[in-house]
Amino acid sequence: MKKIIALLLCLGMFAAVCAGCGGPQITATGDEATNKSADAYKDTYDDLLNYLSAWGYINPLEKNKGVTYTEMRADLIGAKQGRRFNAQHTKNATIELYEFDLSKSNATADEVLSSVKADGSFQNLFGDKVDSFYLSSNGKYLMVYNDTSITDDTKDTDENYTKRQEVIDKFKEFKK
């Protein structure tokens, strides 16, 4: 009897996990989804999110919190705020976006920003060097783009590599 109950519980958990995997992605609609010109947006964190959403890279809508994005502990890198998004164009990528208050910088923020400016990386709390960091042209925003499908062997032929470069270019284009 115990084995049957355990089996039923396992099957129930498996069904619940599978049901959450293929759900539809809700994307931005209306004006925020149609205007792709960086000039149409203000220099704010929310407008950066709306701009990247208009290009179809992320989904920042509040009703999707926990599904398409997660609030991050931005203070760990000295940032004002940050979110990690599941990229909308591939299942293998996440895009983290952080805002720094340049008028009220702190030692942690200064260290992270200067390291990213120097070589696109910094050392995390464990002393490991972390790459794939990109600073906006105005130095106020930081993006971390991580795609597990891109390797040194596939980067010349991988469609995701090309898409990553497109996202980086659009990010840097915002409020030059």
Question: Over which residues does each language-model region extend?
Answer:
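A short acidic-to-branched-hydrophobic micro-motif
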Residues: 87-108
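Positively charged n-region of N-terminal signal peptides that target proteins for export
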Residues: 1-4
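A short, solvent-exposed beta-edge/loop patch
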Residues: 121-176
